[in-house]
């Protein structure tokens, strides 16, 4: 099994050096405005020996934030931050995908300046607590 796990494979047109895939995990290491940090570049760069790195859930809009320090990809500052992360992975011959995410009803109004969250239905999320800089609310 280990022997096969470490053999090259391909997903569509994307060749991978092995079959190890790092699943996306919530890291909460972006800046408060969602910009990826040097720590994120280091973290993903350290894991670039996997065949594929799938970076954490990343917000696609400023009105869709469900936890503090959640990374985004909806402005130029975010894009530049992700470029550094991508470069850190590519420098080690790694491949990286970004998990694009809109949390919908899991968005918390405390994290979007009191705005109404945008979701596919008006059904509230039960027990919608969130972590804020001032603790859980």
Task: Give the residues covered by each predicted segment.
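Flavin-dependent oxidoreductase catalytic cores
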Residues: 1-137
């Amino acid at each position: 099994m280990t022997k096969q796990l470490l053999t090259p494979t391909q997903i569509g047109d994307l060749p991978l050096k092995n079959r190890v895939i790092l699943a996306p995990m919530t890291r909460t290491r972006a800046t408060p405005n969602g910009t990826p940090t040097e720590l994120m570049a280091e973290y993903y760069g350290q894991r670039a020996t996997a065949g594929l790195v799938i970076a954490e859930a990343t917000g696609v809009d400023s009105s869709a934030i469900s936890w503090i320090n959640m990374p985004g990809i909806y402005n130029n500052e975010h894009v530049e931050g992700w470029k550094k992360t991508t470069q850190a992975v590519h420098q080690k011959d790694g491949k990286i995908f970004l998990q694009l995410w809109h949390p919908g009803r899991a968005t918390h109004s405390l994290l979007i300046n009191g705005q109404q969250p945008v979701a596919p239905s008006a059904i509230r999320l039960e027990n919608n607590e969130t972590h804020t800089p001032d603790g859980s609310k």
